[in-house]
């Protein structure tokens, strides 16, 4: 079920976030998840539902009457409770590579320096084996919660990779390194705030810190208002034939001329027509050597046969690129709504290729040897492998 948590910190800053949990999830586990999202230690949190505080940490959420879509209030106590901690005390707050999470990161960044120092000193990070540096406990919790695992993979890829590797030692090392790095940054931040206000170096660093906060705030707004801007799109390719040989052509209205790789020209048997007097250097993002030019060749798009000229490049990953010279010559129109390329001189159209039919150099990178696997399948496979390794480790540790 999906629960919305309205969080009020001790400094009266507010934040709202959502958690996907099971109905039989116990309250102490829920407190730990709230700590990861809000930064409020579980021992200092008070959870209220329907104006009634939830106190029994071993009862399930469903036993309190919580259901899908409900809202709970998380308050930070004025003074930490001195009684012994619950089952998951002081779980480490993960720094998701300093990427602001919508609605959660900005208030925490504005905490007073004293509050930050109380949670970020190196002594706290390395002193308590059952507290902030209990990687085995944290690993088991993340592996048991697919929602938190997906957030970790999105916001802290290095730690997620170490977690899914199944190697507890590697996971512990990465976790401690990130905690220590966070402590160093916080100490540097506190030092800058307490430095001489007329120190130019300190002021420059404070200015840079403010600039980084503005960047993260801008990114937070983008993640909330336009999350699609963080996705990747595949380029526009079409099927065609050159001299009777099938070729996948890249449609690029930003390229000045139509080009073809030397390997593709050899496959299409048009290297004999290359005029090497047109040799030179093609400049764009990088540079490529132009071997020469084929002044006239026949390109077949669907049922149309169109005359075209090519500049032949020596080292080019894509076989063929339809540039602006070819597109304007045949009055081509890129219709993204219909996902087609319209040939204006003939009225015919051809569909842009889906990612599965693109050449390997044009597909989105999912990892070596895994180009044909969808991202969600990769995530499921990695999660299954990590759970299996965790179960095997638990079996080996049994007396």
From Swiss-Prot:
Residues 1-81 form the Ubiquitin-like domain. One of its GO terms (biological process) is proteasomal protein catabolic process. Gene3D superfamilies: Acid Proteases, Phosphatidylinositol 3-kinase Catalytic Subunit, Chain A, domain 1. Residues 99-134 are annotated as: Disordered. The modification Phosphoserine is found at residues 106, 121, 128, 150, 194. It is found in: Cytoplasm, Cytosol; Chromosome. It is an enzyme of class 3 (hydrolase). A motif (Ubiquitin-binding) lies at residues 376-395. The active site is at 252. It holds the Pfam family ubiquitin. The modification Phosphothreonine is found at residue 104. Changing residue 252 to N: Abolishes aspartic protease activity. One of its GO terms (molecular function) is identical protein binding. Aspartic protease that mediates the cleavage of NFE2L1/NRF1 at 'Leu-104', thereby promoting release of NFE2L1/NRF1 from the endoplasmic reticulum membrane. Ubiquitination of NFE2L1/NRF1 is a prerequisite for cleavage, suggesting that DDI2 specifically recognizes and binds ubiquitinated NFE2L1/NRF1. Seems to act as a proteasomal shuttle which links the proteasome and replication fork proteins like RTF2. Required, with DDI1, for cellular survival following replication stress. This is Protein DDI1 homolog 2. It comes from Homo sapiens.
